[in-house]
């Protein structure tokens, strides 16, 4: 029997469930209905599976199979509420903690790069895509460790230069970075989009050793040192992992909060695939 990639395993649900906020009533208000009355709330696990279903398949929220997951509009409301409560970034953080405990976050070689996607309906963090004839697009700036595990992600308009996203991406690592002492031991790999003195200063200010290489430089190094591979490719591979979540291939979310929620959940699932079985 084929396991569907949106069927959440018991192992993953055990990580998610404690993060979901309980529904609370305001102390100062008086309610006509007693607690527990009214329509029965949706099963939280089914709600989470519905969110993963949308993320994996790329379908519209209103196209969710109601017979499997329940009300599509309710699931979307839960998604927004959980995003505002920080559920997805907490899940990502928990995954990184388990990954660190299991084999250690590979801080020594980190890589950063941006990737652009179409965003025809976006109203926030959107701009003309210079590689798509000026059509609306968004960019995600991604930082990964040496194994391609995502550490930070920032969304912006497609017309924002990678260098302008360098500092926000480095400053928004979702777990605490270990203190770095001299001599510096953590390298940051990037392509020529991050060349120049301002980027170099920003990298060094955060105690990284800049390792900025263009493809031409990498080709020369490969000829001189056969068998040597560029370390920057790992971030490009992680961008391709993100693209397997089809809801991220084209951004249809109007609001930034929705887009960020999908990005954070995708990053969390990528991390957990490293440490446990997530589909079941």
Give the positions of each predicted feature.
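Short alpha-helical elements
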Residues: 1-280
């Amino acid at each position: 029997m084929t396991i569907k990639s949106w069927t959440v395993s018991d192992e993953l649900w055990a990580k998610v469930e404690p993060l979901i906020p309980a529904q609370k009533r305001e102390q100062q208000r008086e309610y006509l209905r007693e607690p527990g009355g009214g329509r029965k709330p949706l099963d939280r696990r089914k709600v989470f599976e519905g969110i993963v279903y949308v993320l994996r398949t790329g379908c519209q929220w209103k196209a969710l199979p109601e017979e499997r997951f329940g009300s599509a509009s309710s699931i979307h409301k839960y998604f927004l509420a959980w995003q505002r409560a920080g559920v997805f970034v907490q899940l990502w953080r928990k995954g990184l903690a388990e990954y660190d405990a299991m084999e250690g976050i590979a801080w020594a070689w980190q890589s950063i790069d941006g990737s652009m996607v179409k965003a025809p309906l976006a109203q926030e963090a959107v701009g003309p895509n210079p590689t798509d004839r000026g059509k609306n697009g968004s960019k995600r700036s991604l930082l990964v460790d040496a194994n391609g595990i995502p550490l930070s992600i920032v969304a912006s308009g497609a017309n924002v230069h990678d260098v302008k996203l360098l500092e926000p991406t480095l400053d928004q690592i979702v777990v605490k970075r270990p203190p770095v002492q001299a001599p510096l031991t953590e390298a940051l790999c990037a392509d020529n989009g991050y060349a120049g003195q301002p980027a170099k200063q920003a990298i060094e200010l955060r105690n990284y050793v800049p390792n900025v290489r263009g493809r031409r430089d990498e080709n020369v190094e490969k000829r001189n040192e056969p068998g040597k591979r560029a370390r920057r490719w790992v971030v490009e591979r992680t961008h391709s992992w993100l693209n397997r979540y089809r809801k991220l291939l084209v951004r249809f979310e109007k609001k930034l909060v929705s887009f960020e929620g999908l990005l954070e959940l995708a990053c969390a699932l990528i991390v957990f695939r490293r440490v446990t079985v997530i589909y079941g």
